[in-house]
């Protein structure tokens, strides 16, 4: 019995010792775990502080890089971009610096340094504009000098223009108008609604009205009239008609006519120099109106002999074989009543022109 009790007590003591050992080991383990947890906390805090310091250093490095970039960038950049970069840099610096230093940096960024850059950019931007505008200013006087040098070279042209403008401008304008010739036409009259009667001709489906003045007023009655030729020069709007002519009505040829006459032109200029020209003038009509002769001769004189340039007076004399003559005065337009006069074209002997 004693042995059993001794054995039981020894077993109980062994169990107690093992439990104590396990308790101690568990407590030791718990202390180790707590110590590791405690150790880990400061290490995490240290790592976070290191990261914050790294970010602060990186931010300061970026601000320094931004400042160096701003100093290296050309002065032609706009001031608002620099302000934006500085404000962004100041925002980054807020993480690492205290509030007082942030206010200092903001005040520094608000200082008139960008204004100096703006003034420099404006001065530099205006300088190339002045360089661009200077070449036209240097070139502008050159054409003025050329015009001054050109004007004394043409006094005769100016004299001709001043002479032509008051005296011969209207005559030159009239005798350079286009003329129209129509053969074998049919003429008819309408009821007169003006003081002058008109013969109507329709060549090429267009109506031309011809005023019957002078001898034509009695020669042509109610009509109609067939086989007539007309020489048309459109006149000004005298009778409230857009397109009309005066005179120039003749009979159509009964045979072909090629009658050459001598045309002699004598011209005396303002300096007293006299020039003479002799040529042939072709007559192709049995009956020809004074309107057609006068207009065609003056137009030829304008084109070949500068009539109504600086000279515009003189006469054109149509001499007939029977001793008669018809005179056109160059300083005035042929009268309307004479535009209706008709002569025998084959009876013309010669034509004399005197221009002065």
Swiss-Prot record:
SUPFAM superfamilies: Bacterial enterotoxins, Superantigen toxins, C-terminal domain
UniProt-annotated stretches for the region Sialyl Lewis X-binding: 228-326
Gene label: ssl3
Residues in the signal sequence: 1-30
PROSITE patterns noted in UniProt: STAPH_STREP_TOXIN_2
Biased composition (Low complexity): 114-141
Any single GO CC term annotated in Swiss-Prot or TrEMBL for this entry: extracellular region
InterPro entries tied to this protein: Enterotoxin, SSL_OB, Staph/Strept_toxin_CS, Staph_exotoxin, SuperAg_toxin_C, Superantigen_bac, Toxin_b-grasp_Staph/Strep
Protein name, as recorded: Staphylococcal superantigen-like 3
Disulfide bridge positions per record: none
Outcome when changing residue 186 to A: About 100-fold reduction in cytokine production
Entry comment, domain topic: The C-terminal domain contains a V-shape binding site for sialyl Lewis X.
Sequence segments annotated as region (Disordered): 61-165
Source organism of the structure: Staphylococcus aureus (strain NCTC 8325 / PS 47)
């Amino acid at each position: 019995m004693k042995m059993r009790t001794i054995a039981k007590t020894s077993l109980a003591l062994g169990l107690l010792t093992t439990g104590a050992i396990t308790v101690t080991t568990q407590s030791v383990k718990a202390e180790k775990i707590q110590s590791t947890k405690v150790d880990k906390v400061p290490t995490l805090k240290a790592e976070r502080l290191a990261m914050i310091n790294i970010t602060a250093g990186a931010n300061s490095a970026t601000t320094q890089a931004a400042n160096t970039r701003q100093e290296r960038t050309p002065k032609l950049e706009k001031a608002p971009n620099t302000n934006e970069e500085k404000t962004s840099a100041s925002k980054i610096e807020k993480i690492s610096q205290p509030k007082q230093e942030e206010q200092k940096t903001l005040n520094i960024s608000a200082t008139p340094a960008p204004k100096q850059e703006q003034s420099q950019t404006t001065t530099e931007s205006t300088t190339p504009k002045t360089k661009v505008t200077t070449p036209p200013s240097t070139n502008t006087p050159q054409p003025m000098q050329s015009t001054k040098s050109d004007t004394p070279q043409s006094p005769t042209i100016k004299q001709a223009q001043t002479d032509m403008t008051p005296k011969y401008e209207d005559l030159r304008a009239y005798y350079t108008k286009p003329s129209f010739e129509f053969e074998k036409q049919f003429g008819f009259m309408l009821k007169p609604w003006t003081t002058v009667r008109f013969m109507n001709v329709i060549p090429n489906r267009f109506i031309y009205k011809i005023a019957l003045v002078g001898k034509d007023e009695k020669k042509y009655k109610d009509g109609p009239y067939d086989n007539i030729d007309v020489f048309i020069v459109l006149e000004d709007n005298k009778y409230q008609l857009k397109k009309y002519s005066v005179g120039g009505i003749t009979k159509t040829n009964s045979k072909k006519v090629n009658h050459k006459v001598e045309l002699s032109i004598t011209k005396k200029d303002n300096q007293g120099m006299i020039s003479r020209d002799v040529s042939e003038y072709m007559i192709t009509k049995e009956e020809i109106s004074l309107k057609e002769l006068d207009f065609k001769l003056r137009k030829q004189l304008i084109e070949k002999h500068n009539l109504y340039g600086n000279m515009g007076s003189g006469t054109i004399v149509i001499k007939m074989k029977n001793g008669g003559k018809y005179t056109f005065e160059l300083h005035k337009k042929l009268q309307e009543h004479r535009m209706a006069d008709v002569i025998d074209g084959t009876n013309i002997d010669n034509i004399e022109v005197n221009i002065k």
